[in-house]
């Protein structure tokens, strides 16, 4: 059995059938003898076919070649130089981190980013120079001190040079602190101390003088501790009147009974302690 394969064109064709009826049709093939039988009303039916090609769909290539709407490019934020940031007024501020005080130092506001960057670079060079000179002074002080310890003959010369270097380092540290705290220095220099009211403390000196004069004129009286006969606590006798010690009449000791501790045992919980195992000599009678 052969399989019928439709051509490619026929497979692409679309057919539309239009069917309708004509109620006024008059065609009749019956004879006159059949007139006595009831017959249904004949209706003429019409069928029309319309064939057409389907609409060609867009291919993927056509879609790729179509005009694409341009995508909106993301606007990247402009990167300003280090130490420069924009101000709401449209100008640019410059600031730098002080390596000695670990705080930010304000350098000012400028019209362009280039001016602000230049101020930052100049201040950074200044800080780098101060840091390098400070490290050089520290290393030289360490070497001079070690040489001073090793060679005692040249101790005076080395120590003098070490003192000079330490003074130089102290002055350098003062300069660094002054440069780092310029704002604080300006506040103290502009402050007027003449308006400060100093309290009058002269009344303290007057009270101190009066206390000293009273102490010099006072005399200590120790007579109140003595009786009329100038004997302190003459009427008090500890042994004769107040305390009575029994069994010591006529300053003689009393007789004590003889005690034998060899048969005595001390019992503490589950342990017994007998003195018979430890005493090798018989006890002596106590007189």
Swiss-Prot record:
Key words of the record: Activator, DNA-binding, Ethylene signaling pathway, Nucleus, Transcription, Transcription regulation
GO biological-process terms attached to the record: ethylene-activated signaling pathway; pollen development
Coiled-coil positions: none
Subcellular location: Nucleus
DNA-binding region (UniProt annotation): 80-140
GO CC annotation: nucleus
Record bears the keyword DNA-binding: yes
PROSITE patterns from the UniProt entry: AP2_ERF
Protein family according to the UniProt entry: Belongs to the AP2/ERF transcription factor family. ERF subfamily.
Function: Probably acts as a transcriptional activator. Binds to the GCC-box pathogenesis-related promoter element. May be involved in the regulation of gene expression by stress factors and by components of stress signal transduction pathways.
Identification of the protein by name: Ethylene-responsive transcription factor ERF116
Source organism: Arabidopsis thaliana
